[in-house]
């Protein structure tokens, strides 16, 4: 059904504020991009919603620029994946997974049909469905014409999409050259000049083959991109996660060059997801293992981008990957939380998009397993940035920790758990750029399970990011407060003169005198006025598909 493949969320725009970055020396010239050119979830269902709790809920979107859905056939991507990615400013594309070698008759026919299609129609199709590009596993060989025509078609589509979708990006694997022949040069040179394209004729971003690990290759590629007046950050150093390639001397080379990172692996499942049973095979154990794998891979072995380990040439992605430097070594955590609050409120229930039950505003509605990545909330920007100084990198050896839990939720099937002991520590939650007005309502909701501590909500403004605004006015929890592990505590604050007219730059929590504290975070929101009640939807058709003791499956359009 088309409705499951039409994204209803337009890509949100990311913003840059170096004052709320972990690494202040990263800017638009060296802040690496990342393409995850990998499958999503299981190949049978991809990102389509279903009733399976143990499904993939990727959540580190702030470190991803583009998700190339490897098991989504060319031109067909589940809307749920596009919706959550677009909320976070991430592009999503499908993949033409052409086999290695001479171009088959089937793919010749496919490409000829594509090449005869009017560029405007192709652009309209992609825009209608919400797709942000097309990707090609270009490791074929043919006699130029098909490859040339395919390239020219994408140049035309790029020009049409430039004003309609600013994150639109086509991907090309760097084996098939401009002339349709195979090359293992692993770099941008005259073999890929037209495929990459100059500033006026952009065709594809180039995913370099896996042997890019030399100064000569990287320097040549960067210099060549600059002569074409293209940003070299649209060159992706390919990483074969399945094969562990490049096998030696890899990551340290990237420190010196503005080349981005491209992840591949494997054909049917991504490597984070495929072997998530390394710590056990229960559904929740596998979900926790997957979460730890991705958190360590993207934010370092500490799961805190403020104190990542030293850069190595390792290619690991397992649960105990504690010595891994993490993608946050190379790139900032991106945020889209900057829109006009009069048009849309900011609301996060810390919901991952799956669960063993479904809660609505603290009430259990059912105990059925469910999955819909498309309803995932905005999640903490940097992921567990703890520090003893605000926006700092002073991380204690032992202190507070945080994780997602599927044991409770205010809305959905998950929430955030913060726990541990420390006298003074900050947890940075959201990088924002909201223009606040008098009367805006800030709500924070939590559940205090055990332990004690003083917890305050920290808000800072653009231009004075390290200075909390009247922190004592935003108390959430005091150390002598009674424990209540059954009820969600709501704290609301109305924006007054201290915040009105300022751009909110940071939302954080300040923990003082924490002693074995254990609390759940269930909501963080900023709402202006009252939301307009949407029009009642018109049901054009309904169909009962199946029913059993667990519930009913139906279809409404």
Residue ranges and their predicted role:
Residues 137-312:
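Substrate-binding surface in catalytic domains of secreted glycosidases
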Residues 381, 416, 426-455, 491-493, ...:
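Extra-cytoplasmic beta-strand recognition segments
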Residues 499-502, 511-527:
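Extracellular carbohydrate recognition
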Residues 398-426:
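Short carbohydrate-recognition loop motifs
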Residues 1-8, 235-396:
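Substrate-binding cleft of secreted/luminal carbohydrate-active enzymes
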Residues 465-502, 514:
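Extracellular carbohydrate recognition and processing domains
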């Amino acid at each position: 059904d088309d409705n499951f493949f039409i994204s209803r969320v337009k890509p949100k725009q990311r913003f840059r504020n170096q004052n709320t970055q972990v690494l202040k020396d990263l800017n638009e010239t060296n802040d690496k991009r990342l393409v995850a050119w990998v499958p999503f979830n299981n190949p049978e269902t991809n990102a389509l919603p279903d009733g399976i709790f143990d499904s993939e809920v990727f959540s580190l979107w702030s470190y991803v620029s583009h998700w190339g859905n490897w098991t989504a056939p060319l031109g067909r991507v589940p809307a749920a994946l596009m919706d959550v990615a677009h909320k976070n400013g991430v592009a999503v594309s499908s993949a033409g997974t052409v086999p290695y070698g001479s171009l088959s008759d089937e793919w010749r026919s496919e490409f000829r049909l594509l090449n005869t299609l009017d560029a405007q129609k192709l652009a309209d199709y992609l825009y209608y469905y919400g797709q942000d590009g097309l990707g090609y596993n270009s490791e074929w060989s043919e006699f130029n014409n098909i490859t040339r025509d395919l390239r020219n078609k994408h140049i035309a589509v790029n020009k049409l999409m430039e004003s309609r979708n600013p994150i639109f990006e086509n991907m090309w694997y760097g084996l098939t050259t401009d002339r349709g022949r195979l090359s293992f040069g692993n770099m941008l040179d005259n073999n890929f000049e037209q495929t990459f394209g100059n500033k006026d004729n952009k065709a594809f971003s180039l995913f370099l083959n896996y042997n890019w690990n030399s100064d000569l290759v990287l320097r040549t590629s960067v210099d060549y991109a600059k002569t074409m007046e293209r940003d070299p950050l649209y060159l992706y150093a390919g990483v074969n996660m399945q094969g562990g390639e490049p096998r030696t001397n890899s990551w340290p080379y990237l420190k010196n060059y503005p080349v981005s990172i491209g992840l591949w692996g494997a054909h049917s499942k991504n490597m984070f997801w495929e072997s998530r049973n390394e710590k056990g095979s229960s559904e929740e154990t596998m979900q926790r293992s997957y979460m730890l794998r991705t958190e360590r891979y993207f934010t370092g072995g500490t799961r805190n981008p403020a104190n990542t380990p030293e850069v190595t040439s390792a290619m690991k992605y397992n649960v105990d990957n504690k010595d891994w430097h993490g993608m946050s070594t190379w790139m900032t955590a991106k945020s889209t939380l900057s829109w006009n609050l009069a048009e849309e409120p900011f609301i996060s229930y810390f919901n991952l998009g799956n669960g063993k039950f479904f809660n609505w505003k603290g009430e259990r509605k059912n105990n059925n397993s469910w999955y819909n990545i498309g309803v995932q909330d905005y999640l903490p920007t940097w992921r567990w940035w703890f520090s003893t100084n605000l926006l700092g990198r002073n991380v204690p050896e032992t202190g507070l920790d945080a994780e997602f839990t599927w044991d409770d939720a205010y809305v959905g099937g998950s929430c955030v758990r913060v726990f541990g002991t420390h006298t003074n520590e900050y947890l940075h939650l959201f990088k924002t750029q909201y223009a606040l007005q008098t009367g805006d309502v800030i709500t924070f909701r939590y559940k205090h399970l055990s332990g004690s501590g003083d917890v305050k909500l920290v808000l800072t403004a653009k231009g004075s990011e390290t200075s909390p605004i009247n922190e004592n006015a935003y108390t959430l929890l005091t150390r002598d407060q009674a424990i209540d592990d059954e009820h969600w505590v709501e704290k609301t604050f109305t924006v007054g003169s201290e915040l009105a007219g300022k751009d909110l730059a940071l939302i954080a929590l300040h923990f003082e005198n924490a002693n074995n504290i254990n609390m759940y975070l269930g909501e963080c929101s900023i709402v202006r006025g009252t939301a307009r009640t949407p029009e009642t939807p018109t049901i054009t058709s309904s169909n009962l598909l199946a029913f059993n003791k667990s519930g009913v499956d139906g279809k409404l359009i």
